[in-house]
Every structure is written in structure tokens, then in C-alpha cells.
């Protein structure tokens, strides 16, 4: 897992914006390529387990930024999540640091949760329509939305559901992984 501080002090707004634009561009390209690959794939829905994890076109990044009293960005932390096999490998501060706010890629959270633990959720499987390479498209959309939210300076997290066309929001990351996932799942059951 690659951790890299891009900005640690104030006065780095240009760098923050550059990183946001770069991610937005790369995720947009990933989205286009994912659609292209998706057209070549067939639907594969399993009754007992979710489809096997497929390679990604681009690594997924989580953007964090701390805020000063006047809410201006102070720092940016990029976490490359591509090597994560399960939540146990995630750094402790990822879900516990109350001083960090993020426009986080919740698509990746769901993806790694479902594929690493092979969770069977019949209702979610029907509503989200899991299929081969479908999650690649799903993640591309969520990455794009995360990049956009970071660009506009949002401190909330949004999950874009292409099949349901609604947003799930989470304003606090002080909870445990299970709490966050349970909130998301409960929202999906509505």
C-alpha cells in the first residue's frame, strides 16, 4: 500500500486542485474504458457468492484533507487501495481519525467488503445486479463522483449507484467499518 503526503501545510491550494483535476481526468478515462469492456462482457450472477474480483484499469485512490478553523484545506493524504485484500489491512486511522474528512470512494469499500468476505446479500445482489466487470464500471462512477466531491471541497461521502440512481451519504467516519457498512446496507434496503 502506497501512502503519500502531497500537501502538509497551508498555502498548497493549487496542488490540491491539481491533484483533484488529475484524478477526475484519470477516473473519467477509466469510466470510458470500463464501458467499452462492459459491452464485451456477459451477465454472471451467482446465487451463492459474488463474482470473482476482476483487475482494475486504474488504481483507486482515497483523498483525505484536514481543515483549519476557517475550513480551508490544510493537507492531503492519498492512499492507494489497490493492494488491499481485506479491511484488516487498512490503516487504523482510516476509519477512526475524527480530524479527517473525506470524499471517499465508497464503491471500493463495498467492492472490497463483498469480494473479500464473499458476503451473500440476495436483495443487494438483485438490486445492484452484480455481474462480471459490472463492478468495474460501478467503481469508475463512484471514483469520478469522489473526485468531483473532493474538487468542490465537500466533507461528506457519496456513493453513486448507477442501477438505482440514488446517493447514500455518510457524514462521519468515526464509526467502525461494520457500522459504516451497516448504515449503507440499511439505506439500500429502503
Curated annotation (Swiss-Prot):
Residue intervals passing through the bilayer: 15-35, 58-78, 94-114, 148-168
A GO-annotated cellular component: membrane
Record keywords, A-Z: Membrane, Transmembrane, Transmembrane helix
Cellular localization per UniProt: Membrane
Membrane topology: Multi-pass membrane protein
Note: Almost completely overlaps NOP13.
Protein name: Putative uncharacterized protein YNL174W
Amino acid at each position: 500500500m502506497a501512502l503519500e503526503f502531497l500537501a502538509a501545510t497551508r498555502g498548497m491550494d493549487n496542488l490540491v486542485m491539481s491533484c483533484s483535476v488529475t484524478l477526475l481526468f484519470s477516473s473519467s478515462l477509466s469510466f470510458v474504458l470500463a464501458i467499452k469492456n462492459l459491452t464485451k462482457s456477459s451477465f454472471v450472477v451467482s446465487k451463492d457468492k459474488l463474482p470473482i474480483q476482476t483487475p482494475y484499469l486504474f488504481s483507486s485512490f482515497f483523498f483525505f484533507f484536514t481543515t483549519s478553523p476557517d475550513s480551508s484545506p490544510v493537507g492531503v493524504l492519498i492512499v492507494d487501495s489497490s493492494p488491499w485484500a481485506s479491511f484488516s489491512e487498512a490503516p487504523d486511522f482510516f476509519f477512526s481519525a475524527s480530524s479527517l474528512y473525506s470524499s471517499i470512494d465508497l464503491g471500493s469499500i463495498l467492492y472490497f467488503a463483498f469480494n473479500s468476505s464473499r458476503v451473500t446479500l440476495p436483495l443487494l445482489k438483485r438490486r445492484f445486479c452484480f455481474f462480471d466487470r459490472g463492478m468495474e464500471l460501478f467503481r469508475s462512477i463512484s471514483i469520478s463522483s469522489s473526485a468531483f466531491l473532493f474538487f468542490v471541497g465537500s466533507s461528506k461521502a457519496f456513493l453513486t449507484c448507477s442501477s438505482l440512481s440514488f446517493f447514500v451519504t455518510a457524514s462521519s467516519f468515526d464509526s467502525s467499518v461494520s457500522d459504516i457498512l451497516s448504515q449503507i446496507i440499511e439505506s439500500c434496503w429502503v
